[in-house]
């Protein structure tokens, strides 16, 4: 057993429904086999367990590991393709790079960079958009297993309106998806996600095949994109006889508590009602929404309809792996949206980056650092004299220190990361 000594910040109680930031200065967390067995003032935990090893994390702040609910593994080398809206950006930047995943050696190199980037950003769990090629998804799961990340991913499928080399058929999509799920779902920390790219690029037959895979893989998730860009939404309405976007998935039984839909920048009230009633979650991807000019996310309307919301980096339309940056951009977005904006404080941002993500991904064992949870955590320790170190040192209280972390922090300030109490990154 190990006692971690430090200052711990987390959000076990949802700040959108009255919870506040939990702050425990000089606390002790007793961890055995990756699980937090006791938590209290360091002195008390030490007295009760005098013989255990101590890992001293003083001089920094310990947060739960981040949960990234939407990130594309084959797009890391496409980050920074600025200046285009979604459909043009896909054609110009994202899809040519995704086509390179046909070469499994190339995909393996990208997968290694991808898992390192996530871990370095303090992200311990992620719902990852895979590749259109089964072998590339296979190397992603292998790379994630080596590092030990908690990954949910799957084969991305499409059968129309993308470049030819990325298309599949409903039969092949079903067979390849099921084979990958049988190989990886529930193995180590890996889980499978059924992943049609978006209904723009998927026929009803393909979405029906996705539903069959979801049914045949208990505990799998469903993920896709929704209501991101006006031109995309108009095309989807044309293709599906004027339907609201969420219903293009819902009519196939793909929208429920297992579902995580990315973006939802321009939902109708009917879309929000269905998402709220079914318990589906939305991955809010604020830097991507700004970079592609997709729009300002209507958070207040999501909250009104009881829709679960968490954060996604959406690399490569998003601008990097750090959920600190996504939190700050989420805050900016609400400031800019006008009367409808929800004023986010630092507890909201931490919740969106941690516990909300764990909830969206169906991972009740992570998201905060309570007794009974797994020790998935990160130590933020900025370099001495850096603007963040100065800001944290002179903060009046922990909420203010946390706001400064979201404002000034980057992956460079993440000093160490643990999953199940195993040290990943230093
Ligand atoms: N919609 C369909 N594919 C994509 C993608 O790769 N990125 C984003 N942001 N939206 C999408
Ligand atoms: Zn995306």
What residue ranges belong to the model's regions?
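Histidine/acidic-residue-rich catalytic or RNA/ligand-binding cores of hydrolases
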Residues: 230-242, 271-276, 293-302, 319-335, ...
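Alpha-helical scaffold segments that flank or form the walls of functional sites
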Residues: 81-149, 173-186
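His/Asp/Glu-enriched, well-ordered alpha-helical/loop segment
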Residues: 251-258, 300-389
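C-terminal cap of metal-dependent C-N hydrolases
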Residues: 15-17, 374-426
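N-terminal metal-binding scaffold of metallo-dependent hydrolase/deaminase domains
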Residues: 1-48
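Metal-coordinating catalytic core of metallo-dependent amide/deamination hydrolases
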Residues: 135-264
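Active-site gating loops and adjacent loop-to-helix segments of metal-dependent hydrolytic enzymes
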Residues: 77-107, 155, 160-170, 230-258, ...
């Amino acid at each position: 057993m190990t006692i971690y000594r430090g200052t711990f910040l987390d959000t076990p109680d949802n700040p959108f429904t009255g919870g506040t930031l939990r702050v425990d200065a000089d606390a002790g967390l007793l961890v055995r086999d990756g699980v937090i067995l006791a938590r209290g003032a360091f002195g008390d935990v030490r007295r009760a367990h005098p013989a255990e090893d101590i890992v001293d994390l003083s001089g920094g702040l310990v947060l739960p590991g981040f949960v990234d609910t939407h990130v594309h593994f084959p797009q890391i080398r496409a980050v920074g393709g600025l200046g285009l809206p979604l459909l043009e950006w896909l054609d110009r930047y994202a899809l040519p790079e995704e086509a390179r995943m046909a070469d499994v050696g190339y995909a393996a190199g990208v997968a290694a960079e991808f898992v390192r980037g996530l871990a370095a950003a303090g992200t311990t769990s992620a719902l990852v958009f895979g590749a259109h090629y089964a072998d590339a998804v296979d190397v992603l799961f292998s790379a994630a297993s080596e590092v030990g990340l908690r990954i949910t991913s799957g084969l991305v499928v499409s059968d129309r309106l993308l470049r030819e080399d990325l298309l599949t058929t409903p039969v092949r999509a079903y067979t390849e998806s099921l084979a990958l799920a049988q190989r990886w779902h529930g193995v180590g920390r890996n889980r499978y996600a059924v992943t049609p790219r978006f209904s723009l690029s998927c026929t009803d037959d393909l979405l029906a095949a996705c539903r069959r895979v979801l049914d045949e893989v208990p505990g799998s998730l469903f993920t896709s994109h929704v209501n991101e860009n006006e031109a995309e939404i108009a095309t989807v309405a044309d293709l599906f006889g004027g339907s609201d976007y969420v219903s293009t998935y819902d009519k196939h039984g793909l929208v429920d508590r297992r579902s995580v839909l990315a973006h939802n920048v321009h939902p109708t009230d009917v879309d929000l009602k269905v998402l709220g009633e079914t318990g589906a979650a939305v991955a809010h991807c604020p830097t991507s929404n700004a970079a592609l000019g997709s729009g300002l996310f209507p958070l207040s309307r999501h909250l009104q309809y009881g829709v679960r919301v968490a954060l996604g980096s959406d690399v490569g339309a998003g601008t990097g792996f750090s959920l600190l940056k996504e939190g700050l951009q989420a805050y900016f977005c609400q400031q800019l949206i006008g009367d409808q904006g929800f004023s986010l404080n630092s507890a909201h941002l931490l919740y969106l980056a941690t516990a909300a993500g764990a909830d969206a991904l169906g991972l009740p064992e992570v998201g905060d650092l309570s007794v009974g949870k797994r020790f998935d955590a990160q130590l933020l320790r900025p370099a001495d004299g850096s603007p963040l170190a100065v800001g944290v040192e002179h903060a009046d209280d922990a909420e203010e220190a946390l706001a400064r972390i979201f404002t000034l922090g980057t992956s460079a300030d993440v000093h160490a990361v643990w999953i199940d109490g195993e040290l990943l990154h230093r």
